[in-house]
Swiss-Prot record:
A Pfam family hit: GHMP_kinases_C
InterPro entries noted in UniProt: GHMP_kinase_C_dom (IPR013750), GHMP_kinase_C_sf (IPR036554), GHMP_kinase_N_dom (IPR006204), IspE (IPR004424), Ribosomal_Su5_D2-typ_SF (IPR020568), Ribsml_uS5_D2-typ_fold_subgr (IPR014721)
Protein origin, superkingdom: Bacteria
Active site: residue positions: K10, D148
Annotated region (Disordered), positions in chain: 292-315
Similarity section: Belongs to the GHMP kinase family. IspE subfamily.
Disulfide bridge positions per record: none
Functional description taken from the UniProt entry: Catalyzes the phosphorylation of the position 2 hydroxy group of 4-diphosphocytidyl-2C-methyl-D-erythritol.
Primary enzyme class: transferase
Name of this protein: 4-diphosphocytidyl-2-C-methyl-D-erythritol kinase
Any one GO molecular function term: 4-(cytidine 5'-diphospho)-2-C-methyl-D-erythritol kinase activity
Swiss-Prot/TrEMBL GO biological process terms: isopentenyl diphosphate biosynthetic process, methylerythritol 4-phosphate pathway; terpenoid biosynthetic process
Chain's gene name: ispE
Length: 315
């Protein structure tokens, strides 16, 4: 059997960061939206090899950028093991071994949840293979895997609280166009949060202006309320990113912000053509490692706005 699943990347339109909690995480208030950059996972069962215990994953391969782990610490691999573990709690029947392949369409280490999208797509694939587990179980496992995985599982436009894993739908009337500038050098998320704490930065926990802008639906309204509490910390660690922001504004972007904990710079544009023009201008200037035009939220039927099954083939 071969099962293919897909999940989208994300952008944080608002990221409010509260103080660190006892568990080491920060309290977040964030507004997620899917972007039309996707990860595609293919799970292939090896019917002639049955596994009674331990990981069912025999191999993980990747098409796309270098630097993606192909070992058991990969989030997609962990997602498969986690859901198989849930099944073994009530059914110890041996399962076929599997091979995983990831076709990456989201830049690596860019703050757009590529790894979390891999995990979400893997959860959907395993659910189609040996499920159904139910949405509650899938979301529970997703939250155990990472703070962004539940959103990547559901997609759309969501208000996230807690670590970002507690999700509520938000109404969004607009379609937004971006040029996403990927940096050639990564930025450690723990380092950014540590710098945030060190700088004693204020927290933006009120999403009322963002909610109103999303109801308005215009790019101009959204440009006025984009907020990321981690931006000063990220820019302190990587001052060169300010040059990217300025280059984007010169090229015609309406607004600019650090995406998540960085280092990707998100440039909000008037429309799809403007996003392409800004991306072309920045690529001509040699700004960043790559520049990706993107749209948010992902259009289409509700069932495809989050992680979803693309195809199931029986060999």
């Amino acid at each position: 059997m071969r099962i293919t699943a897909r999940a989208w990347g994300k952008i944080n339109l608002h990221l409010g960061v509260g103080p660190a909690r006892e568990d080491g995480y920060h309290e977040l208030v964030t507004v997620f939206q899917t972007i039309d950059l996707a990860e595609t996972i293919t799970l292939t069962t090896l019917e002639d090899e049955l596994v009674e215990e331990g990981s069912v994953v025999r191999q993980l391969t990747v098409t796309g950028p270098r630097g993606v782990p192909t070992t058991p610490d990969n989030l997609a691999w962990r997602a498969v093991d986690a859901l198989v573990g849930r099944r073994r709690e009530h059914d110890r029947t041996p399962l076929p071994a599997v091979e995983l392949h990831i076709d990456k369409g989201i830049p690596v280490a860019g703050g757009m949840a590529g790894g979390s999208a891999d995990a979400a797509a893997a959860l959907r694939a395993v659910d189609a293979w040996i499920g159904p587990f139910g949405e509650e179980t899938l979301l529970e496992v997703a939250a155990e895997l990472g703070s962004d995985v539940p959103f990547c599982l559901l997609g759309g436009t969501k208000l996230g609280t807690g670590r970002g894993e507690q999700l509520v739908d938000m109404l969004s009337r607009g379609t937004y166009h971006w040029a996403l500038v990927v940096s050639p050098k990564g930025l450690s998320t723990p380092e950014v949060f540590a710098k945030f704490d060190e700088m004693s930065l204020p927290s933006s926990m009120d999403v009322t202006p963002m909610s109103q802008a999303l109801l308005d639906g215009s790019a101009g309204a959204l440009a006025e309320v984009l907020e990321n509490d981690l931006a000063p910390a990220a820019l302190s660690l990587r001052p060169d990113l300010r040059k990217t922001q300025l280059a984007g504004l010169r090229a015609g972007a309406l607004a600019t912000m650090v995406s998540g904990s960085g280092p990707t710079i998100a440039l909000l544009c008037d429309d799809a053509q403007s996003a392409r023009d800004v991306a072309d201008a920045l690529m001509d200037e040699g700004v960043g490692l790559s520049v990706h035009p993107a749209t948010s939220p992902v259009p289409g039927p509700a069932k495809n706005r989050g992680a979803h099954i693309v195809s199931i083939e029986s060999e």
